Amino acid sequence: MKVTLPEFERAGVLVVGDVMLDRYWYGPTSRISPEAPVPVVKVENIEERPGGAANVAMNIASLGATSRLVGLTGIDDAARALSQALANVNVKCDFVSVPTHPTITKLRVLSRNQQLIRLDFEEGFSGVDPQPMHERIQQALGSIGALVLSDYAKGALTSVQTMIKLAREAGVPVLIDPKGTDFERYRGATLLTPNLSEFEAVVGKCQDEAEIVERGMKLIAEFELSALLVTRSEQGMTLLQPGRPPLHMPTQAQEVYDVTGAGDTVIGVLAATLASGNTLEEACYFANAAAGVVVGKLGTSTVSPVELENAVRGRAETGFGVMSEEELKQAVAAARKRGEKVVMTNGVFDILHAGHVSYLANARKLGDRLIVAVNSDASTKRLKGETRPVNPLEQRMIVLGALEAVDWVVSFEEDTPQRLIAGILPDLLVKGGDYKPEQIAGSEEVWANGGEVLVLNFEDGCSTTNIIKKIQKDSDK
């Protein structure tokens, strides 16, 4: 299937549903409580993240699309924290405040990347007048390409049929992440995205793929749906549409750390891709790739365009490509468990030339994995002058990540990558040029950890500076 890269900046999506605040308490455990046979967690870090429908909206915004969110909250600190967190990531919120109810909050306590307990603070919003939400939907319909209804059965979507009717009359597709077994509520929707458990709770246990397809097609006909996407965890996802053969996509996940919010990512990417003008098949392709990325992260998470770019070309976030420092540490840890030798180098790599490619290929031959650390734009200006870099950081990193010799690409803001190298501690640190090993940033830390430091020669006659001078000279003719 040929997939067109979505123009997410063109897309506008409205998310309506159950919003909540996810709180995370992190800390080590080293003893058992004397009061009860439970571990004692010394809380050292607290995080607050938007959850539920708010996480869907964040996933849409993280792709660069215009994301609007309508939901019910209380008038409390949790609502204010939720609004601020969403504003920080460019989600446009239009909440209906309900003074008699608290904002739904879920508190998770974690230690060593394991969730120990979850505490829920909620009363549900059933019985709240839905008219203010209908008015907000009506106002937004002229500026969106998709409507997402994110149902967590907390009371925000008690009038789903009215919402579907409003959108369909305006020609806007309606995507629903369902909850419960009453799918009659979702009659006439464009697409439902149940997971396998939710699907089987409605149609019964399916013994094989054929039964999933047969019962799914009956569900589509019964509830007048345009399509059905069944997400199947480690088995990927299956798209069913009337008059078309089923489309099954295997999972792209490399490592699974946490499935929290994965369904939010799927429907968010689906909606943003459809609103960009892509087909439903293409939207599912991107959503499947995004799901493979997000389950490799801890807690509710989003996927950036760079991560999605890596994933769709088969370079999953936990395995290969452009990544953040924290993601790189996870990938390196996984490589070490496999007994792989990690090589690391760094540079500006402004205009990639034959000398760079040859150098990186030679560096890769010295181990099993190659990390390339790249100076940020600000760092490059300080080192090379105000006219550099010619190519911005994101473009430099994407080009490097596309090289067969390069496994991981990461950026750093400082003048040297010493701090980054000290955090990664590669088995072998290499640098090109006329350096002495002791002059290379990070060499002391690598040696102290038992690693090696090596200087490689650049190919003669290749220089970014000379290329720039030649371009300038030719343009002056």
Curated annotation (Swiss-Prot):
It is an enzyme of class 2 (transferase). It comes from the Bacteria. GO terms for cellular component: cytosol. Keywords: ATP-binding, Carbohydrate metabolism, Kinase, Multifunctional enzyme, Nucleotide-binding, Nucleotidyltransferase, Transferase. Its EC number is 2.7.1.167, 2.7.7.70. It catalyses: D-glycero-beta-D-manno-heptose 7-phosphate + ATP = D-glycero-beta-D-manno-heptose 1,7-bisphosphate + ADP + H(+); D-glycero-beta-D-manno-heptose 1-phosphate + ATP + H(+) = ADP-D-glycero-beta-D-manno-heptose + diphosphate. Residues 344-477 are annotated as: Cytidylyltransferase. One of its GO terms (molecular function) is ATP binding. Catalyzes the ADP transfer from ATP to D-glycero-beta-D-manno-heptose 1-phosphate, yielding ADP-D-glycero-beta-D-manno-heptose. In the N-terminal section; belongs to the carbohydrate kinase PfkB family. In the C-terminal section; belongs to the cytidylyltransferase family. PANTHER family: BIFUNCTIONAL PROTEIN HLDE. NCBIfam families: cyt_tran_rel, PRK11316.1, rfaE_dom_I, rfaE_dom_II. This is Bifunctional protein HldE. It comes from Klebsiella pneumoniae (strain 342). The lineage of its organism: Bacteria, Pseudomonadati, Pseudomonadota, Gammaproteobacteria, Enterobacterales.
